[in-house]
Amino acid sequence: MKKFTLILSLLFAMVACHGQSKRAVVDYVTTPEDRALAEQVLADLQAHPGEEPGAQMVRAAKDLLGQPYVAGTLEELPEEKLCIYLTRTDCILFVETCLGLVRAARQEGDFEAFASELLQSRYRDGVCSRYEDRLHYTTEWARQGEKRGTVENISGSLGGVALDHPVHYMSAHPDAYA
């Protein structure tokens, strides 16, 4: 329940969605279907420019409802690459995708802007060169997002208590996930 509350808190407490993106050429893997769906959601978001970021997060999430849950979506390739899949997802990818779409749309961005946002959100310091660069834990993802100014953790205002419990198993044992 606490994880669910944290994810909901993050989902509805998006801030700085109007901030400037670190736009760079991004190397990614996607499919024509995934790209088309992303462009469709971007167009829907850009058609409602006056909406608050939280409302746009909900809009993006509703636009993506019905896509199947697929575990291990990012482990399909032999080497680490930014994988952009909207036609299949897992829970954290869903949140990352919605946030990236909203941030790109608020900058009147295109698919490339979305890819750049996703890279910044999914990988430590926006660097995707190896499995260990990926933010594997929701807690680390949230802390990195707070550091970048893309999310605000409102758990404390909802009665949550911060626990500083370092987690690093996946990053320290990448061979266990090959």
Task: Locate the predicted segments by residue.
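Positively charged n-region of N-terminal signal peptides that target proteins for export
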Residues: M1-F4
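Hydrophobic h-region of N-terminal signal peptides that target proteins for export
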Residues: L10-H18
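Cationic-aromatic interfacial patches
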Residues: K22-L93
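Acidic/His-rich structured neighborhood in mature extracellular/periplasmic domains
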Residues: Q67-A178
